[in-house]
Amino acid sequence: MKLPQTGGCQCGKIRYEITEAPQLVYTCHCTDCQRLTSSAFSMGVVVAETAFHLSGSEPRPLQRTADSGRTNTRLVCPECGSWVCGTPRDGVVRVRAGTLDDTSWLRPTRHIWTRSKQPWITLPQGDEIFEVSDPRR
């Protein structure tokens, strides 16, 4: 993986730069992520808040109470509606992997909310697998 990594929303009004290697790449199989992405799971990249730099349009915050009971705030483009990332929490930002300009290096190693995963999905042996949320995050 080459640094910095860049990305943004579908219309290009929001852009970002990641200046440090990510701490983690993960998949989330919760029903909210399935609905939000119209897919079987979402994929996120966890980066230090200090290494994530937004530019362009101001993202619009959307809040929702997750299956865990925690309120999550998604930052979306006010123009195209792309879900770019979450608000910073605990010193990190969870960036939506599909918004990266280069996704060739992505390899998730942690899978959360697998009790809701689609039955046809097989998770790799050796990866960290949690039926619900990762208790460390």
Residue map of PLM features:
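A short Gly-Trp-Pro
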Residues: 1-137
